[in-house]
């Protein structure tokens, strides 16, 4: 009888916890770089590129806005600086979205005032604190989590002190490429960046990239 009561209590607790959880997704032009102080890897993101939040917690996500933008008759890839977004969790599902960027004017306007919108599926705008995550050095994205940890310890606008000492994603078993030493060689920055990101990718992505590169000859 005691076992049955304990099992029932546990089930009720799990049900209650689940009832207060929402799911966060994003518009197609947003990538999640970090979630609550940790690298946004497969351990944190679902196959649908979403993650759970809890209404009793403050959550923080680092996002990047990416768009293929027209420049006259040409097109190029625009990628924003990382944006730190902090907000209170909710039991509703949430969408983080950025405006559509189609041309140079849109890019300029976004650079002048980079921000995203956090909105529930019911249409309620969630209050946020946002700030660009400043990065330095060669391939600054490689040290994103360290930079974010320092940011969270700084007391800045969108910082969350409890995430300042978050365990690095490498310790969670992120990818083989990140566990080992990444070595880049090349005569220019572009070549070195290609080598770096190739080593960060999983095997399937590397194969697709190599097949794509062969077709560019």
UniProtKB/Swiss-Prot annotation:
Keywords: Signal
Keyword Signal among record annotations: yes
Signal peptide (from-to): 1-21
InterPro entries in the cross-refs: UPF0319 (IPR018635)
Keyword Ubl conjugation: no
Domain of life: Bacteria
UniProt similarity note: Belongs to the UPF0319 family.
Stored PANTHER family: UPF0319 PROTEIN YCCT (PTHR38108:SF1)
UniProt-recorded name of the protein: UPF0319 protein HS_1349
Taxonomic source organism: Histophilus somni (strain 129Pt)
UniProt lineage: Bacteria, Pseudomonadati, Pseudomonadota, Gammaproteobacteria, Pasteurellales
């Amino acid at each position: 009888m005691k076992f049955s009561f304990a099992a029932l209590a546990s089930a009720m607790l799990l049900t209650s916890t689940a009832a207060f959880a929402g799911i966060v997704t994003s518009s197609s032009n947003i990538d999640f770089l970090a979630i609550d102080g940790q690298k946004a890897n497969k351990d944190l993101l679902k196959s649908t590129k979403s993650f759970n939040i809890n209404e009793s917690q403050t959550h923080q996500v680092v996002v990047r806005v990416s768009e293929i933008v027209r420049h006259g008759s040409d097109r190029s890839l625009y990628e924003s600086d990382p944006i730190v977004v902090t907000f209170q969790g909710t039991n509703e599902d949430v969408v983080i979205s950025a405006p559509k960027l189609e041309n140079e004017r849109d890019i300029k306007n976004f650079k002048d005032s980079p921000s995203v919108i956090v909105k529930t599926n019911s249409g309620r705008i969630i209050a946020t604190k946002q700030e660009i995550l400043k990065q330095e050095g060669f391939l600054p994205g490689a040290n994103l989590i360290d930079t974010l940890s320092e940011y969270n310890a700084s007391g800045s606008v969108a910082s969350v002190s409890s995430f300042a000492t978050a365990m690095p994603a490498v310790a969670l078993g992120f990818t083989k490429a990140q566990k080992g030493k990444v070595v880049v060689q090349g005569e220019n920055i572009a070549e070195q960046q290609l080598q770096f990101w190739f080593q960060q990718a999983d095997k399937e992505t590397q194969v697709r990239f190599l097949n794509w590169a062969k077709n560019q000859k």
